[in-house]
Curated annotation (Swiss-Prot):
It comes from the Bacteria. It comes from Lawsonia intracellularis (strain PHE/MN1-00). The lineage of its organism: Bacteria, Pseudomonadati, Thermodesulfobacteriota, Desulfovibrionia, Desulfovibrionales. It is found in: Cytoplasm. This is Putative pre-16S rRNA nuclease. PANTHER family: POLYNUCLEOTIDYL TRANSFERASE, RIBONUCLEASE H-LIKE SUPERFAMILY PROTEIN.
Length: 142
């Protein structure tokens, strides 16, 4: 199965895609949040072009699994997305995915100005790869 992963953010949203077998995750792009309408047009277009079997959305939580304001914003985003796209949507809990993505990029020599442009995509890659590495019984569909 092919997946598109979304690391939703209020300024930038990172997108990653899997291979057709659902084994490896790759960065795709970041979508800049201008208006909600423009954002959803770009996102829906990208999803149709990629033709995934399902979507994976990162759900940020704290270390104790408690939810925050951004967690609620992501849940609201998922509700809006499900009205526009008729695909299964899976949640992938995430803690510090952007921080870990930044460390990944620094470790391979990315400079600060380049990191900013690809950070959200790399966070989406981390989210998607974590999802792909889970057994199917561990996956949470909404």
């Amino acid at each position: 199965m092919k997946y598109v992963a979304i690391d939703y953010g209020t300024k930038y949203t990172g997108i990653a895609v899997s291979d057709s077998m659902g084994v490896f995750a790759f960065p795709k792009q970041s979508i800049i949040m201008t208006t909600q309408k423009e954002f959803f047009i770009k996102l829906v277009e990208l999803i149709y072009v990629e033709s995934p079997d399902a979507l994976v959305v990162g759900l940020p939580v704290l270390f104790d699994n408690s939810e925050t304001l951004i967690t609620r914003q992501v849940r609201n985003f998922i509700k809006r997305l499900k009205h526009k796209i008729m695909l299964p949507v899976f949640l992938m809990k995430e803690i510090l995915s952007s921080y870990e993505a930044k460390l990944d990029l620094q470790s391979v020599g990315y400079r600060k100005n380049k990191i900013k442009s690809v950070l959200d995509q790399q966070a989406a890659v981390r989210i998607l790869q974590s999802f792909l590495d889970q057994s199917e019984s561990e996956r949470v569909q909404v």
